[in-house]
């Protein structure tokens, strides 16, 4: 059973001053703990990151081994049917790795519910900065750090910056900051939200979240 929760945020400008309007976010969350959905989405995410392409050859796939090495009886040696037996050097591998598909299907509504649950749990650590994407004109780390200082954002902690468009200016301005992860709103995922201590959203990004994840 889901219930609706409303969160209201007052956005800041690039100088850290509050603007005279609000953004409201309507979230659907479970009455009971939604941690199991977050866990399922994490398993799905980790599975999609794996290649799982390692492969070894069995005795039937190794080249050679068609001829019986020696006759069955009379030699005093142990019987052998192929020199590509797993017991022999150069033989096949028993129960070796094979390419496999690792995936967990998760319904769209389940994934949306997991993301909304995490956003609600992190509601006190979310900050909205107006026009961050268009306001930064120079690709300088110093300029981005000053904006964070004015908005009282601690760059010693993990910061998730969610934008609609990963512009070259923002990429260059944040790439030298080890604790800042720049993420497009269309790629929002549970792992990035979980790792972040602070989440910065632009106004365009929060509108994208409303349309894509909170319908």
Swiss-Prot record:
Any one Gene Ontology cellular component term annotated for this protein: chloroplast
An individual GO BP term: translation
Keywords (A to Z) from UniProt: Chloroplast, Plastid, Ribonucleoprotein, Ribosomal protein, RNA-binding, rRNA-binding
SUPFAM superfamilies: Ribosomal protein L4
Pfam families: Ribosomal_L4
InterPro entries in the cross-refs: Ribosomal_uL4, Ribosomal_uL4-like, Ribosomal_uL4_dom_sf
Similarity annotation: Belongs to the universal ribosomal protein uL4 family.
Annotated function: Probably binds the 23S rRNA.
Protein name as annotated: Large ribosomal subunit protein uL4c
């Amino acid at each position: 059973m889901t219930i609706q929760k409303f969160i209201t945020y007052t956005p800041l400008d690039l100088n850290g001053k509050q603007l005279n309007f609000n953004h409201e976010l309507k979230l659907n969350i479970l009455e009971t703990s939604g941690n199991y959905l977050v866990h399922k989405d994490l398993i799905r995410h980790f599975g999609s990151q794996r290649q799982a392409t390692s492969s070894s050859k069995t005795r039937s796939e190794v080249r050679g081994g068609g001829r019986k090495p020696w006759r069955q009886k009379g030699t005093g040696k142990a019987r052998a049917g192929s020199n590509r037996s797993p017991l022999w050097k150069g033989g096949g591998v028993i129960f070796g790795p094979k390419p496999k598909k690792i995936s967990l299907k998760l319904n769209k509504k389940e994934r949306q519910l997991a993301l909304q649950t995490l956003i609600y749990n992190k509601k006190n650590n979310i900050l909205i900065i107006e026009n961050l994407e268009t306001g930064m004109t120079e690709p300088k780390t110093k300029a981005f750090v000053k904006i964070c200082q004015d908005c009282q954002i601690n760059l010693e902690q993990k910061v998730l910056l969610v934008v609609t468009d990963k512009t070259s200016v923002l990429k260059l301005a944040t790439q030298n900051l080890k604790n800042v992860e720049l993420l497009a709103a269309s790629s929002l995922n549970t792992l990035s939200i979980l790792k972040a201590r602070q989440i910065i959203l632009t106004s365009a990004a929060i509108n994208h979240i409303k349309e894509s994840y909170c319908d």
